[in-house]
Amino acid sequence: MKPPPPPGPPDVADLRELIDQWAEFTSGLAVADYSFDLDNWLNDVDVRELILEALPMFSREEMGDHALKLDEADKAFMAATRDFKNCVWGKGTARKEKWTPQKNWWYFRTPLRSNSQLEDELATVR
């Protein structure tokens, strides 16, 4: 049996879709309380990590208007969140993945407008 063919080249449309998801998420943080739990927060900020991983594959020209959209979404996220004492995935995961507050800042922030369930779960993050 032949092995499957290697994946094709990355598609900038996939990156644009991730940026659209990130922009929608960040715009919501500014207008309403974050009403979900820690698992959802992790999923939401993981989108930004996927964007970081894809960015080196495309120029700002290839990204088109989405380059500016990403910049604006990042600013919106920063304005609607606060520094968190640890990586929201925990120190062990941050160490293993080599995530830092400088490079992977989305993993070291939590919503300003939160909820009690999320805050209780964040209190257990080590």
Please place each PLM-identified region on the residue numbering:
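Long, compositionally biased low-complexity segments enriched in polar/charged residues
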Residues: 3-54, 62, 66-119, 126
